């Protein structure tokens, strides 16, 4: 009997896919082991070789580390772009047309989809696109971060080493190599995108606008946006149901009633004149009057009232005139100097108040308007 699994891969021997889980691998292994076990097929020497291949395939695929090492070539070959490809394209990008660079970026984009990236990386488009639309594409690509695992870049097969310390050292070296390859790949892709952006022919087709043209363009864009907002508002207003407006009116009415009632209550506050405080109800005022602070302010106010009353009585007694003092000055009505020169003598005379006094009183009067005896002699 010829060996049906000759020159086959582990996945082909166990008849599973590369994304099959351990349960599916075990199920297929048991089925094939029962079918090709030598004890079930005595006298057939080829079954020993077939069964050995089945066991070897199962041992590899059931162990994660062995499976990764076995899949190195498969993982690498499922991607169309490797580090050396990006480096080569970057070195020749100035000599090739833009269409070739755009096609190469599309290969990068497809590789990320295969790697399971959820980022929607855009294409570079063609030369007919406006730079206004192409510029955001480059901005997104310049933040590129690959989802490729680069596990095929591992240097050592850890499972082949029996010494634990050596195996740990191999694992650290493999992790460093994988991390370096990921970082190197990201940097090369970003450099490639940056170079492609600089060489993009669509940059040269940008029309430079003057300040006036730019202002007019912004004004036109603002006008169109306002028009779209206005139409959207009208459409929304048109689709409003009458019931919704009724509910709004009821809510506004109840809100107005509550505000009005609050204004009425607040328009007549209950006030404590001692503490200069407002209260909402009579109960609050009564509780306040029983407080220590109110009683303290009340005692203080009573003391001030008594103090002011005593001072007022004292001032009244000190300002009391003697009984023989004249009630008013003989010249109670004063005449200003300006009136003296502008009014007639008769008018000025009418403003005087004449008081009958004796000659003795006239000559002995004080200096507030009366002549003394020397002045009288001078007049004579």
Swiss-Prot record:
Localization, UniProt: Endoplasmic reticulum; Preautophagosomal structure
UniProt protein name: ER-phagy receptor 1
Modification Phosphoserine occurs at: 344
Gene designation: epr1
Effect after changing residue 362 to A: Impairs the interaction with scs2 and scs22 and abolishes the ER localization
Swiss-Prot/TrEMBL keywords: Endoplasmic reticulum, Meiosis, Metal-binding, Phosphoprotein, Zinc, Zinc-finger
Pfam families: DnaJ, zf-C2H2_jaz, ZUO1-like_ZHD
PROSITE patterns registered for this protein in UniProt: DNAJ_2, ZINC_FINGER_C2H2_1, ZINC_FINGER_C2H2_2
SUPFAM superfamilies: beta-beta-alpha zinc fingers, Chaperone J-domain
């Amino acid at each position: 009997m010829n060996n049906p699994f000759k020159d086959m891969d582990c996945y082909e021997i166990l008849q599973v896919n590369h994304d099959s889980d351990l349960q599916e691998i075990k199920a297929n292994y048991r089925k094939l082991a029962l079918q090709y076990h030598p004890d079930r097929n005595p006298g057939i020497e080829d079954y020993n070789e077939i069964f050995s291949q089945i066991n070897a395939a199962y041992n590899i695929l059931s162990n994660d580390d062995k499976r990764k090492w076995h899949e190195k070539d498969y993982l690498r070959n499922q991607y169309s772009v490797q580090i050396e490809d990006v480096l080569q394209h970057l070195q020749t990008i100035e000599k090739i047309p833009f269409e070739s660079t755009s096609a190469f970026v599309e290969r990068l984009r497809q590789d990320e989809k295969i790697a399971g990236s959820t980022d929607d990386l855009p294409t570079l488009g063609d030369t007919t696109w406006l730079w206004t639309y192409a510029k955001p594409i480059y901005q997104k690509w310049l933040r590129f971060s690959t989802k490729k695992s680069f596990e095929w870049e591992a240097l050592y097969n850890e499972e082949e080493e029996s010494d634990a310390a050596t195996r740990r050292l191999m694992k650290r070296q493999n992790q460093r190599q994988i991390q370096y390859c990921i970082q190197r790949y990201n940097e090369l892709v970003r450099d490639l995108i940056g170079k492609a952006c600089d060489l993009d022919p669509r940059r040269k087709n940008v029309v430079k606008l003057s300040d006036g043209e730019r202002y007019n363009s912004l004004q036109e864009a603002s006008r169109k946006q306002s028009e779209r907002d206005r139409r959207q508002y009208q459409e929304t207003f048109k689709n409003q149901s009458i019931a919704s407006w009724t509910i709004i009116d009821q809510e506004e009415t109840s809100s107005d009633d509550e505000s009005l009632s609050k204004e009425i209550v607040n328009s007549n506050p209950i006030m404590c004149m001692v503490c200069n405080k407002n209260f909402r109800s009579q109960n609050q005022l009564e509780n306040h009057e029983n407080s220590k602070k109110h009683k303290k302010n009340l005692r203080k106010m009573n003391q001030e009232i008594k103090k002011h009353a005593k001072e007022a009585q004292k001032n009244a007694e000190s300002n009391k005139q003697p009984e023989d003092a004249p009630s008013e000055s003989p010249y109670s009505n004063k005449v200003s100097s300006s009136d003296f020169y502008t009014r007639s003598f008769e008018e000025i005379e009418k403003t005087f108040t004449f008081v009958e006094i004796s000659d003795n009183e006239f000559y002995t009067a004080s200096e507030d308007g009366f002549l003394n005896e020397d002045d009288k002699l001078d007049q004579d």
